[in-house]
Regions:
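C-terminal transmembrane helix and the adjacent membrane-cytosol boundary/short C-terminal tail
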Residues: 328-337, 415-442
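Membrane-water interface segments at the C-terminal ends of transmembrane alpha-helices
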Residues: 39-62, 120-188, 282-293, 314-316, ...
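Intracellular coupling helices
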Residues: 325-365, 442
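Transmembrane alpha-helix signature in integral membrane proteins
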Residues: 80-110, 307-315, 423, 427
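Interhelical loop and adjacent transmembrane-helix boundary motif
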Residues: 285, 319-322, 377, 383-384, ...
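Short membrane-interfacial helix/loop motifs at transmembrane-helix boundaries
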Residues: 18-21, 26, 39-83, 88-90, ...
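Transmembrane alpha-helical segments of polytopic membrane transport and secretion proteins
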Residues: 1-34, 116-120, 435-442
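Transmembrane-helix boundary motif in ABC transporter permease subunits
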Residues: 93-125, 136, 141, 333
Length: 442
């Protein structure tokens, strides 16, 4: 029986039907539908106000209906306060971003070397959890000039008083028998008693440990004396030590003869003092100038000369935590084998940091730097919180001056709009640079 074989033949290629084409308008509408809410908010809250601000800068301050051209710009560019604001903005730009990036880099590197890095980062990052206005309120207290209130001056006063001790009678006045220089008006001989009365001392300003004043007895070959607060409640006799009149402890007393100092001593708790080995006469007892040295009043951090530097320091304290965290994230992304290869080639830690770590971190450092640059250009709230009203003209910036002219009672909206437009013009180069940098690193 003959058999037949059947050979199956397959086509060379298998053709699949083409996928249905999505209409072009649908491929455009779908992304736009997701972007529409963000674009709407961007247009309402950013683009439209920005365009209106530019338009308003060409209209009069009063009602915004009278077109004045570039008059607002002319006034702005010739205004002394705007010049000060621009100068302060330049100072901010030259100091704050560089300091923030440098400190953030150092702290980020150091935190990699310690075991409790997370706690350290949280502490430094904490200022960012509160607003700049609240930061300003905190630093306003820190910067108080009175050492009893301001933390910074309290610490400085403690160091200052170690080397230059304040006098015990900064506000005293000479009593009966004393010249304006707190010296006896009559000479005294050996064996005499010098009575140095002082007045004008409030009860709360009497040195601590003061006891009832006692007139010492004359002693041969010595000059004794007393320094006391010559005031008795209810009335008393001037120049006479009486009950309820206290001595002044710790007062410096000098003994002079022929205009030269021949001895010095200090008073006890009852105000008494003694000069030994004295002979002859013609001496003068005098309270030394150190007795009246005023206590250190503190640095005027919020005065016209230092207010901008003080505010920049507060800003750096706030921003350095952000820089440290971002740079620390960049450090953790650096391949460890690159660093190990550098060590194998004989590089020390400083060389590795300068020639390997920093170049690899440059994109991150650039982002942090530009971000801080934009932040200091629009700085406002921390200045409002820290600077007292009397020195705000010295601490002003362009953003603060814009608010000052527009919303603080002057109501010069055209003038303020011209400052705001100038700020936008200054922002543009930094924004373009940051966007290009992000695209390069993407």
């Amino acid at each position: 029986m003959a058999s037949t074989s059947v050979r199956a033949e397959f086509p060379d290629t298998v053709r699949t039907p083409p996928a249905p084409r999505t209409p072009r308008y649908r491929s455009v509408l779908l992304p736009l539908s997701f972007l529409a809410p963000a674009l709407l908010l961007l247009g309402v809250w950013v683009i439209y106000p920005a365009l209106q601000t530019v338009r308003r800068s060409f209209y009069a301050d009063e009602d915004g209906t009278d077109f004045v051209g570039f008059k607002n710009w002319d006034r702005m560019l010739s205004d002394d306060n705007v010049h000060t604001a621009f100068k302060n903005n330049v100072i901010w730009i030259l100091i704050a971003p560089i300091a923030v990036v440098a400190l953030g880099l150092v702290l980020a590197v150091l935190t990699e070397k310690i075991g409790w890095a997370s706690v350290f980062k949280i502490v430094l990052f904490m200022p960012l959890a509160i607003s700049l206005f609240a930061v300003g309120v905190i630093w306003r207290i820190v910067y108080q000039q009175d050492p009893d209130q301001g933390l910074l001056n309290a610490g400085a006063k403690g160091i200052h008083d170690i080397f230059v001790k304040p006098g015990v009678l900064p506000d005293a006045q000479p009593g009966q028998g004393l010249s304006p220089r707190f010296a006896l008006t009559k000479p005294i001989d050996a064996g005499g008693v010098a009575k140095l009365a002082v007045t004008g001392i409030a009860p709360e300003n009497v040195p601590g440990g003061a006891k009832q004043a006692v007139t010492p007895k004359p002693e041969q070959g010595k000059i004794t004396g007393v320094v006391w607060r010559d005031f008795k409640p209810g009335g008393g006799r001037p120049g006479v030590v009486e009950k309820q009149e206290v001595g002044i402890p710790g007062a410096s007393v000098t003994l002079l003869k022929d205009g030269k100092t021949v001895g010095s001593t200090s008073t006890g708790d009852d105000g008494s003092f003694t000069f030994d080995d004295v002979s002859g006469g013609g001496y003068t007892a005098q309270l030394a100038p150190a007795t009246f040295r005023a206590p250190w009043r503190g640095v005027e951090w919020l005065g016209p000369r230092l207010v901008t530097s003080a505010i920049i320091l507060a800003f750096i304290w706030t921003a350095v935590g952000f820089a440290m965290v971002v740079i620390g994230a960049g450090l953790s992304a650096i391949p460890r084998d690159v660093l190990e290869a550098a060590r194998t080639d004989g590089g020390n830690e400083f060389q590795i940091f300068r020639r390997v770590t920093i170049p690899l971190l440059m994109p991150v450092l650039t982002v942090v730097f530009v971000t801080q640059m934009i932040g200091v250009l629009k700085i406002f709230d921390i200045i409002y919180a820290i600077a007292p009203g009397s020195v705000r003209p010295d601490a002003t910036t362009l953003a603060f001056e814009m608010w000052q002219r527009s919303f603080s009672g002057e109501n010069r909206f055209g003038f303020g709009a011209s400052i705001a437009t100038l700020l936008m013009i200054l922002f543009v180069p930094f924004l373009i640079y940051q966007l290009r940098s992000q695209r390069r690193n993407a």
